[in-house]
A protein has these predicted regions:
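Single conserved hydrophobic/aromatic residue that forms the stacking wall/gate
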Residues: 1-7, 11
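Alpha-helix C-terminal capping/helix-to-coil transition sites in glycosyltransferase folds
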Residues: 6, 19, 163-164
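Short Gly/Thr/Asp-enriched flexible loops that form oxyanion-binding sites at enzyme active sites
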Residues: 25-45
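Short glycine-rich anion-binding loops that position phosphate/pyrophosphate groups of nucleotides
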Residues: 28-31, 115-118, 173-176
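Flexible loop/hinge segments that line or gate small-molecule binding clefts
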Residues: 38-76
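Glycine-rich phosphate/diphosphate-binding loop of Rossmann-like nucleotide-binding domains
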Residues: 69-150
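Glycine-rich phosphate/nucleotide-binding loop
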Residues: 132, 136-176
Length: 176
């Protein structure tokens, strides 16, 4: 009951009135919340539902490193189907626009990770990079969004492309 009252107060009395500019969330044990009788997948889904906003991006920020997620809290087996060219383009547009608006970055650089090991190894370890992720990055470039082709996630965070980026777009929750 306490959690329910607090979240409603936060939404109704603070965010919708624009009394706060941002919300910082901390990790929570979702199973405890769900075991109490409340349905709770995560903060991102909660705020999306409260504000009636279908297109959302989870952004993790820590000391100059920003990581956005293409999907939210999904079982790993559902991730490939959730990643479409259209959904990636929408995420890239949101990230691009919000980095300009919130951080004053005039031309945000986005490093996009691949989904499969080694970014699919040219189709030998999965075709999502070839069929979905690369076409999305190519279309985003045509829309003047500065994004890389899929980068292998296993070495991404040591890559100069990622270190020089304003944000990394990971394909799923624990990849980011």
């Amino acid at each position: 009951a306490f959690f329910r009252r607090q979240r409603q107060m936060c939404i109704r009395d603070r965010l919708k009135d624009k009394r706060f500019d941002a919300v910082v969330t901390a990790p929570v044990q979702k199973s405890v919340i769900n075991d109490s009788g409340l349905s709770f997948t995560g903060h991102t889904e909660f705020f999306s539902e409260q504000f009636g906003c279908e297109d959302v991006v989870m952004l993790l920020v820590n000391h100059g490193l920003r990581v956005a997620l293409a999907t939210t809290h999904l079982p790993l087996r559902e991730v490939p189907d959730a990643i479409t060219q259209e959904s990636l383009l929408r995420k890239l547009e949101i990230i691009h626009n919000e980095l300009m608006r919130l951080y004053g970055i005039s031309q945000p650089r986005i490093a996009m990770l691949g989904l499969n090991p080694h970014a699919g190894e040219g189709g030998h370890l999965g075709r999502e990079e070839i069929e979905t992720i690369t076409p999305a990055s190519e279309e985003a470039l045509r829309r003047d969004i500065d994004v890389t082709a899929p980068i292998p996630a296993d070495t991404a965070f040591t890559s100069k492309q990622v270190l020089d980026a304003d944000v990394v777009l990971a394909m799923f929750h624990d990849q980011g």
